[in-house]
Amino acid sequence: MKASQYNSSLRKKVLIFAAALVLLIALVFELYPRSSQIIDLSTGSGLSRMLRYDDAQVYICGEIHRKVEYQKFRNVLFKYLVEKKGVRVLLMEHGYASGFIENETIQNRMTFSDAFDQFTISQEDYELFRWMSEFNRNRPDNDKISIVGADITDSIEMLCTFCKYLLKDCDFSAADRKTQMLLIGIQKCRLQQRFQNSLLPQLIEQMQTQPEQLEIVLGDKMIHLERALLGWQQELTCNELNDYQAELQFGGKAMAYREDALYANLRRIYQENPTAKYFGSFGAAHVQMTRYVGDGTVHWIDNCFVSRMAGEESFLDGKLTVIDGDVTHEIGNLDESDTNHIILYN
């Protein structure tokens, strides 16, 4: 009888232990972010569980360019990061000049009608920039969203717009006559070909040989011209390394050169403002931490700038959350469907 009671008691204890173990495992899986999360693009539901690192300072998201569903997701994600995580810097995958003009717009120093058509490619872009502009209105400078172009991919149209805008309201009278004539020519230039083939090369030469004359005119704005022209020259070098093909070749010298430039630019941006929180939106191939094959193509960049930012020697020291580029291949398949749910793999 005692043996029977003992066995019955032991079975109860085993069952209680097993039940407790199952409950514990269920809680772990429920509370810890899983390998896939469902994100509702219309409400942002699920975003908080996706972003598992509360102490992250830089969030980098992969994308498929010009996909409507991706852009909706990006907008929801960015607004969430601004409102809940304190992100205040948007890193864009284009050159310094483009980022500068975009930033002037959302700071409400430049009207949307002046330049927005040059860098807006969709309604979703327009809505995001309008939202940032309204968010910044009447806020102190240290709480405003800013935009920085981190890439080396400015168009000649945007660089011309940038130069004209930078020279607006400048006094040329203290510079020498050669500099005055060059800057007046840029201000009045209406032909893109003339700017690209004549005025821009002269401006680059002036920056290299007589930068002090430009600084007399630009003052504190000189740093913006230096960075925009450096990015343009890097873009020319990249095009040359790519044999002037329209698309960069995976595994080629041009791709490696661009990744080096992106990493260096992001390191400089971060080091100039090391306490800010950042969100970056870049092509999926730059962001992927694992190989992905879609449509028979390997979407992967060896030694991409994001993998270096996530590495042990990174200037970020572990303060990075990567939203893998794989997610946007999933979104890309939905851009003609009625659903606003995607599955995020992280």
Task: Tell me the role of every PLM-derived stretch.
Residues 8-12:
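Membrane-interface helix-boundary signature
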Residues 1-7:
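N-terminal secretory signal peptides that target proteins for export/translocation
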Residues 2, 13, 17, 26-346:
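Compositional signal for N-terminal targeting/processing segments
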